[in-house]
Amino acid sequence: MFYTLLFTGLRRSEALALRWRDVDLVLRYISVNRTLHQLNDKSFVFRQPKTEKSRRTVALPPFLSIVLRQHQESQQKQRALLATAVSDDDLIFAQLDGSPLLPHSITNAWRRLVKQAGFQGVRLHDARHTHATLMLKQGVNAKITSERLGHSSVVITLDTYSHVLPGLQEAAARGFDEGLGRTTQDVISSTG
């Protein structure tokens, strides 16, 4: 699940609600159309995503497609031991019997993993922030990054990740010079 959060920028509640029919491992995309929440009485409820723009299709990198295929095969083997089959309506991330994972158990597993790796203060939601930051640093258009995250507008993405933008401004300025075929030495030579 952690790979999915990091490589797609999904929210925890969105990933927990994914069914196998929501993913296409051949065309490599995930359809986000619901979220999973645990109520105070310990029951689960599926809800509409946070905003209309949160209902979205997110392209999968090839690596994640392979990881999810392996996860699906593992899940099928585990279910075979229980004499049950995995269906398209089954949750991708589930207990052995197919029931939903507890949201707080995912967060606790993340904390243990982070601690074992020697990091402190890295929250599960930071996987989403890392995804967005890396997308923007790689020069991915802010609109595309916003769509992947399911933000209601690109303004939210730009406001949230403005710390990434100063370096991008400098890179864009250098890129403009390079696009015109000019170097710093050319400018010095022509003005000197």
Where are these regions (language model features)?
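C-terminal secondary-structure termini that scaffold catalytic or DNA-interacting sites
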Residues: L27-R28, L36-L64, Q70, S74-K77, ...
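Generic leucine side-chain signal with a strong bias for well-ordered alpha-helical environments
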Residues: L5, L10, L16-L18, L64, ...
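Short, basic (Lys/Arg/His-rich) helix/loop patches that form interaction surfaces
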Residues: T8, V58, S74-T84, D88-E147, ...
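Short, charged phosphate-coordinating catalytic segments
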Residues: L5-L36, K143
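Short functional hotspots where side chains directly engage DNA or cofactors
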Residues: L27-N33, R123, L134, S146-V164, ...
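Residues that flank catalytic or metal-binding motifs in active/ligand-binding sites
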Residues: R19, S54-R56, D89
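Conserved hydrophobic/aromatic pocket- or pore-lining residues that grip, position, or stack substrates
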Residues: T4, A15, V32, L60, ...
